[in-house]
Amino acid sequence: MAAASDVSPQSAYIQHHLVHLNNIGEKQSVIAQFNVINYDSVFWSALTGLVVVLFLWLAARRASAGVPGRFQAFVEMIVDMVDEQAKGIVTNAKSRLFVAPLALTVFLWIILMNALDLIPVDLMPTVWRWTGLGAHHGDPLYYHRILPTADLNVPMGMSLGVLLLMFYYGIKIKHPGGFVKELFTAPFHAHGIAALFLAPANLLLNLIEYAAKSVSLGMRLFGNMFAGELVFMLIALLGGAWTGLNAASVGLGIGHVLAGSVWAIFHILIVLLQAFIFMMLTLVYIGQAHEGH
C-alpha cells in the first residue's frame, strides 16, 4: 500500500475537497456510517430551505389582485407550472392541496441547493483560511463542503420522504386492508390456489419496485451533482498548475477560464433539470400510490 506521502498534490486536493465537516473530524470510512453527522450538509440544506420559505412568504404577502409586478408574475409562472403538472398526475383534488405545494417547495429547494455548486470551488476554503477557521488541519472549518445534494445523505433522505408519502397515500386511498392485499395480489392476479403460490412473488416484486423508485430517485440527483462538483474541481486544477509566465502556464490558465465558463453555463441547465426531474418523479410516484395495479 502506498504511503500517504505518495499521494499526488492533485489527488490530495480533490480528496480534501470531498471531506465533510462532521462530528468525527475526518473522512468517513464506509459509505453508510450512521454515527456520522455531516454538519455542513445540515447547515446549507437548512439555510437554503429557510430561504425558500422566506421567498414564498414574501411572494404570498406581496400578491395582489391587480396587475402583477415582475416579482409576482415570476412567482405565478412557477406556481402555475407546478400546479398544472400536479393536476395532470395526481387526480385526487384533496391530495393535491398538499402535494402541489410540496412539489413547488421541493423544486425551489433543490434548485437553490444545486445552485451552490456554481460558487467557485476554492472561494469558501480561501475565506476560511483568511479568517483562520480553516488554515490548518484541526481548525473548525478545515473540512467543509457547501453542496448538500452532492452528499448522498441529503438526496436519499429526500427520496425516503417521498417513499413514506407513497405508503401514506397508498394506505389512505386504498385503506390498510386494500393496500396490503395489493402487495400480495398484484401485478400477477390469480384466484384460488394459484393466488397463494403467486403471493410471495407479488410481494417481492412490489418491495423491489418501492426500493428501486426510492433509491433511483435519490441516486440520480446525487450522481449528477457529485459529478458536476468533481468536474469543477478538475477544472480548478488547471488554474492551480500555474508555475509562472510561460507558454504552458498561460495555456492552462486560458483553458481554466474557458472550461470553467462553459461548464458553469452548462451546469445551470443541470441545476434546473435535476430539480425538475426530482419534482416530477415525486408527483408521479405519489400519483401512482393513488392508483391500483
UniProtKB/Swiss-Prot annotation:
The protein's name in its UniProt record: ATP synthase subunit a
Source species of the chain: Bordetella petrii (strain ATCC BAA-461 / DSM 12804 / CCUG 43448)
Subunit record text: F-type ATPases have 2 components, CF(1) - the catalytic core - and CF(0) - the membrane proton channel. CF(1) has five subunits: alpha(3), beta(3), gamma(1), delta(1), epsilon(1). CF(0) has three main subunits: a(1), b(2) and c(9-12). The alpha and beta chains form an alternating ring which encloses part of the gamma chain. CF(1) is attached to CF(0) by a central stalk formed by the gamma and epsilon chains, while a peripheral stalk is formed by the delta and b chains.
SUPFAM superfamilies for this protein: F1F0 ATP synthase subunit A
GO annotation, cellular component aspect: plasma membrane; proton-transporting ATP synthase complex
Function, as annotated: Key component of the proton channel; it plays a direct role in the translocation of protons across the membrane.
Record family assignment: Belongs to the ATPase A chain family.
Membrane-spanning ranges: 40-60, 99-119, 151-171, 188-208, 225-245, 264-284
Pfam families: ATP-synt_A
Gene3D superfamilies found in the cross-reference section: ATP synthase, F0 complex, subunit A
Membrane topology listed for this record: Multi-pass membrane protein
Gene Ontology molecular-function annotations: proton-transporting ATP synthase activity, rotational mechanism
Localization (cell): Cell inner membrane
PROSITE patterns (alphabetical): ATPASE_A (PS00449)
Cystine residue pairs: none
GO biological process annotation, one example: proton motive force-driven plasma membrane ATP synthesis
Alphabetical UniProt keywords: ATP synthesis, Cell inner membrane, Cell membrane, CF(0), Hydrogen ion transport, Ion transport, Membrane, Transmembrane, Transmembrane helix, Transport
InterPro entries: ATP_syn_F0_a_bact/chloroplast, ATP_synth_F0_asu, ATP_synth_F0_asu_AS, F0_ATP_A_sf
